[in-house]
């Protein structure tokens, strides 16, 4: 059993919960997810089965799209509503749509981001959330991220009693982006505390929300002996790579890891190629400027 399940992760489940449940349903241990979603976040979570676990890094490298909401006027320990409130600054009046749009624009493009203390980023061999739970502080490394777009839906809703303003947004960003930190940063741009209120992942690994299946769907497909209706081919993770179809002779060479010239593959030295045989993506080959040949980068199947 090999392929990618574009799973819809429900709120309340961890990403590992989904992996564990699928291992039980599918009766296989070779299951891996392609990017953690917090328990309070729902949406697209591609899960790799069998030999498809080899493409996890390629799925994770793709950009993500999220829809959610940010609440201005308070802050929590975790930067979302799961944490304890550590600051309140009631708003006397709502920010205008132009003000929040300008704040979002300042966070668009290639920027530096510091991951939250309640995250799985490791520092000196320990996860940041382990330091946080122990009441310890540690210097957090910044990372470079790209926010392709940060669209806000107007000025949102103002709660005069609570002194808060909640604004819906949609974000397209690179891997490794903490959206709850972007919510906090939006507040900083406006000079007020902020927290991410809700979040749904709309796209990941090339899969959209409309393409996902639920755990119940997978269980039903397994019971009907039709699991293939929930599986997508490995090639979904490799759609951005140039593809070259191999004949029987070239496949015999490739499956044994033989280096190939650009002429043999009829290529003008593309940096990396996805090689297919009989309609199935078998491997990735990478061009070596030093050797002037294509060399194996990752094998997915040899039969």
Curated annotation (Swiss-Prot):
Catalytic reaction(s) noted: uridine(55) in tRNA = pseudouridine(55) in tRNA
GO molecular function, one term: RNA binding
Active site residues according to the UniProt entry: 38 (nucleophile)
Domain of life of the organism encoding this protein: Bacteria
EC number: 5.4.99.25
Keyword Isomerase applies: yes
A Pfam match: TruB_N
Name of the protein described by the UniProt record: tRNA pseudouridine synthase B
Species this protein is from: Levilactobacillus brevis (strain ATCC 367 / BCRC 12310 / CIP 105137 / JCM 1170 / LMG 11437 / NCIMB 947 / NCTC 947)
